[in-house]
Regions:
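A short alpha-helical cap/connector motif
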Residues: 1-114, 118-186
Length: 186
């Protein structure tokens, strides 16, 4: 009975997330008030982050990729690109350092940077600032875990298995920077 309720809840959440995606896609398409450029990706049709990241890389013909926080290499192994570096202090990727340690030694620039490291506002803010220093012209920085489903998923310190942390605060702050185009999707 518990498993059935759990599965029903997940299915309803998945169906609703598809509706939300379509709504936000069309809302931003028709009522976009910042005059932001189109990044060439229809968020309403491809939900999985692996396909989103790969499609952005392919569409823009990017050649270099940096992933901060690789954990089990699910995304890192999926991405097909000539030059890719994965940074994680514990497991996954190609470099065993914290993101701060990596950026202090790095001299390489990237077209696409995916941030999924330590899920705290302060660290993500530093990761964004450091990434901007090593981002090629017309490059993109992508962030994961920006939309917690409830209070506990965003609480710091971490108090449950599923955890987004307070990454969302970094997105809010980035939106105040007039030099950055910030896009969000569910």
């Amino acid at each position: 009975m518990i498993i059935k309720k759990f599965l029903q809840k997940k299915i309803i959440r998945f169906i609703n997330s598809q509706k939300v995606l379509k709504f936000f896609f069309y809302y931003h398409k028709f009522f976009n008030n910042k005059g932001l450029k189109d990044i060439g990706f229809d968020f309403s049709t491809k939900k999985n982050r692996k396909f989103i990241v790969q499609d952005i890389i392919d569409t823009n013909k990017y050649n270099s990729y940096l992933e901060i926080g690789c954990f089990d290499d699910e995304l890192f192994d999926f991405i097909k690109i000539n030059n890719k570096i994965g940074v994680d202090p514990v497991t996954g990727g190609t470099v065993r350092l914290t993101s701060d340690q990596f950026f202090s030694k790095n001299n390489e620039y990237f077209d696409c940077i995916f941030i999924d490291g330590l899920h705290t506002y302060n660290q993500v803010k530093k990761d964004i600032q450091n990434s901007l220093k090593f981002l090629n012209n017309n490059g993109v920085i992508l962030l994961h875990d920006c939309l917690p489903n409830n209070f506990y998923e965003q609480a710091t310190p971490r108090c449950q298995f599923t955890w987004n942390g307070d990454v969302w605060k970094a997105i809010v702050e980035c939106r105040t920077n007039k030099d950055l185009d910030v896009y969000t999707c569910y």
